[in-house]
């Protein structure tokens, strides 16, 4: 593995670590928001109008960011039926992996391209409870798209180099 690939690997796994920390923070915020809503409703028969919307936004970001981590860790959904027909280590299996990563990178590009449109349109609409432009929440599509592309390209490079050198 040359210096450029080591640097790319450092960036990719650094971003993954940062995203994992952000997910932990979002999960904590979501739990506190839901818990405070439950306590206020149960004890005081009062409600925080913004808590469920905040929890929903946190959940959406968690889902999308978590899926990007899943791409890097290769834990995303695959067509297992195709892999069951191919012997382990066979060239067809490697081609299927590459094809899958190319599709994920393309999906990331689609997320970025059309996510920007959603963000622009969302900046003119305000969320009901939080009173912020919904475009901020729609940014999760663009961020996830960039992460999909980054992780898929990294894995493609690693798999291509690993295969050429005789190891995976």
Range-by-range predicted roles:
Residues 1-168:
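Alpha-helical transmembrane segments and membrane-interface helix-loop junctions
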């Amino acid at each position: 593995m040359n210096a450029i690939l080591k640097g790319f690997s450092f960036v990719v796994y650094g971003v993954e670590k940062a995203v994992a920390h952000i997910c932990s923070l979002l999960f904590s915020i979501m739990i506190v928001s839901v818990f405070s809503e439950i306590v206020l409703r149960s004890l005081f028969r009062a409600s925080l109008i913004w808590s469920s919307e905040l929890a929903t936004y946190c959940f959406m970001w968690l889902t999308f960011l978590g899926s990007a981590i899943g791409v890097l860790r290769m834990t995303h959904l695959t067509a297992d039926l195709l892999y069951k027909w191919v012997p382990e280590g066979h060239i067809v299996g490697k081609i299927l992996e590459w094809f899958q990563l190319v599709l994920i990178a393309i999906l990331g590009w689609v997320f970025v391209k059309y996510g920007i449109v959603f963000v622009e349109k969302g900046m003119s609409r305000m969320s009901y409870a939080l009173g912020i432009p919904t475009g901020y929440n729609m940014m999760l599509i663009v961020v996830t798209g960039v992460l999909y592309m980054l992780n898929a390209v990294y894995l493609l490079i690693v798999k291509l180099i690993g295969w050429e050198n005789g190891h995976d």
